[in-house]
Amino acid sequence: MPARVKDRISLLGFGGAAIGNLYRAIPESMAFASVAAALAEGVLYMDTAPHYGFGLSEQRLGAALAELDPERRVVVSTKVGRRLEPRPDADLTRVRQGFVSPEPYESVFDYSYDAVMRSYEGSRARLRRDIDVLYVHDLGRRAHGERHPHLFAEFMDGGYKALRQLRDGGAVQAIGLGVNEWEVCEDALAHGDFDIMLLAGRYTLLEQTALTSFLPLCQQRKVGIVVGGPYNSGILAHDGRYGMRRQAPLMYEYQPAPPEIVARVAALEAVCQRHGVPLASAALQFPLAHPQVLSVIPGMGNPDEVRGAKEWLTLPIPATFWAELRAQGLVHPDAPLPETA
């Protein structure tokens, strides 16, 4: 991982899906205010993607940073692997591919060399600035099922060469994958040279299977990790000091949580109550104890969510809390914990 990027990435990052109108429309002013609040809280790493609102998130982030960050202190990452196809007949009032966007496009997976290059140029124009980190978006078997071997080969034979060319030529500083599954990151490291991985939802208080082989490999290869989805679709985004909460159903992986996950969250919350620790604080702080994790990037759709995340991240948590999680088997036995990090 290049030090010129690694040393500039803040522990708390800004996930840009919400300002691309994820599931619901938010006004331009709210998107701008969210970016401004993030900068005010010292957030100097911001992630987006063409898929987020079909270019809307990149446009909004670029416009805000052009005004708020003229010195270009912020490390910006975006993604390739989905090209934007015009859809002039699209119903702009409904949710399309998860977003309510005024942009008449849809995103189509394409991991070829030409598509990656075109995507990079489009993102650079929308962001109005150079791109620091470029991820390939949503490779993997979870995303593509039976098509995964074909698309992985398409990427390694085409899109990967484009990423290498952009990095080696100095157009971007670091390259990696932005995905929801660590297994494809491990496969990619067996076939190529990557600097950083954005892993969403796979190294959290609820899931630590990445510790078995992937994270040790990242340590060996000096690959940095950004943890997306630290709240696991929101099920961990709770105070937790005052008992179970929220309306049913609880959501996990964007669908109703299975009984074993609900039970695990209840066990975590019971420990939170005993130690006076917000569950969301533990969810944000836990991944950062691992030496390869550079940043956590929860979704931030308004200034209150930004300020809340910063408060949760910096709240002191007693060592006895982490010790009880370990003693109860609520975290992997090999997981680094903040009190020993």
Predicted regions and their residues:
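Solvent-exposed, non-membrane alpha-helical residues enriched in polar/charged side chains
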Residues: A36, G62, A66, M117, ...
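An active-site-proximal structural segment forming one wall of the substrate-binding cleft
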Residues: D110-D130
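Short glycine/proline-rich turn/loop motifs
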Residues: G15, G98-P104, L139-H144, P249
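Active-site mouth loops of central-metabolism enzymes
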Residues: A17-S29, S101-M117, H148
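Generic enzyme active-site microenvironment
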Residues: Y45, S77, D130, Y135-V136
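Beta/alpha (TIM)-barrel catalytic core signal, keyed to glycine-rich beta->alpha loops juxtaposed to Asp/Glu
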Residues: M30, E121, A125, D132, ...
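Short, flexible, mixed-charge acidic loops at enzyme active sites
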Residues: R87-F99, H238-R246
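N-terminal binding-site loop/beta-alpha segment at the start of enzyme catalytic domains
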Residues: M1-V80, L84-D89, T93
